[in-house]
């Protein structure tokens, strides 16, 4: 077993061997992505990935574009609606919105995340 453990285990830990192997020199941190805030939404984009993350906070109505979108309900509840149909998502639920325009409705105190390609 060629493992050098530094902690978080009941197995033998070799702190001095870990410190010998570890590179403790400072490095540049990646740039912090500042959100673009508009009303009840915060959009995180332009961070080197081909998608954007939109945080929807509290009671809001957010248009859903004709693109694939992952919807994650962290707290509260949300309703997705399009063409007269509705889908309800509660805390802990994840949904997938596929290439159709619609609307996301969230309730007071909700925290919902949308992840979609840019």
What are these regions (language model features)?
Residues 58-85, 90-94, 100:
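Glycine- and acidic-residue-biased ligand/ion/polar-headgroup-sensing regions
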Residues 1-5, 86-90, 99-118:
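Ligand-binding loop in jelly-roll beta-barrel domains
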């Amino acid at each position: 077993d060629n493992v050098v453990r530094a902690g978080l285990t009941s197995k033998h830990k070799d702190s001095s061997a870990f410190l010998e192997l570890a590179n403790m020199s400072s490095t540049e941190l990646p740039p912090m992505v500042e959100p673009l805030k508009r009303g009840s939404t915060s959009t995180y984009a332009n961070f080197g990935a081909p998608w954007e993350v939109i945080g929807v906070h509290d009671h809001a109505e957010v248009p859903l574009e004709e693109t694939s979108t992952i919807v994650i309900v962290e707290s509260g509840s949300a309703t997705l609606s399009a063409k007269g149909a509705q889908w309800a998502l509660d805390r802990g639920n994840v949904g997938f919105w596929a290439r159709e325009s619609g609307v996301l409705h969230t309730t007071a105190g909700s925290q919902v995340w949308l992840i979609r390609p840019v």
